[in-house]
Amino acid sequence: MFSLNSSTIAFSIGNFNIYWYGVLFALSLLIGWYISNNIVKQLNNFGYSNLTLNEFDSFLFIGLIVVIISSRLGHVLFYDFQFYKENPIEIFMIRHGGLAFHGGLIGLMIYVYLYCKKKSISWLLLLDVLSIAASAGLITGRLANFFNQELVGKIWASEYGVVFPLVDTFPRYPTQLYEALTEGLLAFFIQIMYLNINKWKSFGTGRYAVIFGIVYSTSRFIIEFFKDVEEIFITNNLLLTVGQILCILMFILSLILYSIGNRKISESI
């Protein structure tokens, strides 16, 4: 059995505290930026894109703001609306945790579509680039959830359980680590393997976005059964969480994206 520290502070500078959540969240953004920049650079070298790195960095900077705002709004609206309705000031307390992936995804996809339409750039190509960066960033992003002791698993009477002292004294499933390994590492590994096979020619087909969408939605749907989150009734015999419902929609969207990519490939032949 493993127990986390009761403090979420990584280190302090004078009276200013630096939290693990902020450190790891910033690291996830840095990893995503580094990987996406290198992909765009390679695409330019092979003639698959004319998007300059300066343009891409500007796109990412605004995209980051969009993702943070939409992720926070997603958490507020999807998961704990009543609490934030009664405590509106807490909406701005991001350091307490509470960024919903699906909210960020919705905001980012809208931003990508509008940006690409304005710049006459392939939106599928940008989605592919961002999907690989997102899967890599999610590895440390879920570690941020782990050290912030949020999104914890159900009580698990096992020597492999983890105690989150800010929650209670019971060992629980470390579901954040499960998600880091599947939504992050597994999705990234499959995408890189597909990239090695196709030698960059598959960018702009939406394939990497589809791989990420399917791996993420499937793995999170399963892991949600082990999370200590409120379930909602769908039928008399089936209980699903809000996250699982959003994952079902994400899976369907991935299949639609696959169909769109296939149609574009057929038109180019």
Question: Which residue stretches match the model-derived regions?
Answer:
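Hydrophobic, membrane-interfacing alpha helices
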Residues: M1-I269
